[in-house]
């Protein structure tokens, strides 16, 4: 009997920790940085929502879902904002949402992780890797960065496809504060 109890305890200790489900809490941000004819500008995507399943001890079981309403994209420059929402860029009348989904993360060095996912934007789906750090606590925080190849999504077509005017790569950064999922 004692052997069975010891075996049961050892078996439970050997099981991997269960991943925790998280939802986005207030204080989160999703921003981008680009440039137009050498002038740097930043923008953000208000209203995005994030769900995460994550256990730092078992990153391969991770899952990240981000829903991004494109209608509110803003750079603080009304002219840029109008153009970004139009057909040459995000074309919000045709597709008002973007979505990023990653399953199975990789542990990197220095406490970083990589989420190899797919971004669905403007009817296109392309691979995008988000590298991130994870800060434990009552409200854990994910801080991450990614690079998006805008032309692969048809962002900035026509005269805007000229990469001397707007670079092909757009830097994305995020800071997501989480709370346990209900």
Walk through the language-model features, giving the residues of each.
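Positively charged n-region of N-terminal signal peptides that target proteins for export
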Residues: 1-4
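Hydrophobic helical h-region of N-terminal Sec-dependent signal peptides
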Residues: 6-12
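N-terminal signal peptide c-region/cleavage motif recognized by signal peptidases
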Residues: 14-16
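Low-complexity, acidic/polar, glycine-enriched regions of mature
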Residues: 19-182
